[in-house]
Amino acid sequence: MAKIKSVIGFEVDSNEIRAVEISRSSGTYSILACGKIPLQEGIIEEGFIRDADRFNIALTELMQNGGFRATDVVVGVNNENVVMRYATFPKVADDKLRNMVLLQAQEFIPIPVQEMEIDYVVAGDGVNEDEQPVTNVMLVAARRNMIEQYINVLSASKLQVVDVNATVLSLCSGLQSSVVGDEKYAVLNLTEDLVNFIVIKGNEISMVRSIQIPERIEGSVKRLFAGKEEADDIEQIGTVLGQETSSSVSYYAMQNQSSPIEKIFLLTTLNKNAQLVNGITEIFANIPVTVPDYYTANKFGLDQQVINEFAGCIGLAIQALEVK
């Protein structure tokens, strides 16, 4: 990717588009534009744009009313068309690792690799049961036709897609840069489409799990993200998140008895996180669950709640601007 001066971090899910334009000068990041726009039901389904015309109308309105000027865009995706898997490979020279990962990726990904764009993040080195050196990676695979669709639709609106990344990884990067220290922590990320559970220490990822929203709370989650929640929706969602957290932590503990999780961060774009934490801790109280504040050293002149809501977009843009 060529070096760029400003870029738009861009997220799409079933109910809205979010975008942040960021510039970098002398190592300092500045937010030039920030905004979101709701999407009508049916425009996005199963991670795909089903109605490109209505999508472009909403996108154009967001870009114009939000004062966006950059044309370079980094798209963040986190839906059922993105697969993340923790995998271990024999230790090889750095220049040979990518070929090995691509050749063996099918063993870990439940979708034909011919249909996927595959990338990976090195999660650290170790040894296997036979004391042989290994490299741990997190595989990230996204359906090629979904990526191509976003590139084509955004190009029709005169936007240039310079990269496509997993949004949850940009959120994790933001935590590492501004929130966490040396502790081992877990990220519990709730979107309208998925729940992610990722265990991290420093730059090393040691577990990743993604599940679709359970059918029994689909309606509650949709209403909550639309701002139309009913009286017991938050309680029901919190209960399920608590159960999923308990299951994930138990599985991790069985595999890593000597390295326990010390803290869990709940991530959403909602303003109901405190209530969700209460629901989670009613079910699972073994490890502290908190809601992080992102980029507190530089609030970019915006309210902290806004920074937290757009943390994924901010992280996507910052990562692109860091590329030399």
Where are these regions (language model features)?
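Hydrophobic/aromatic-enriched cytosolic interaction surfaces used to assemble or bind macromolecules
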Residues: M1-K324
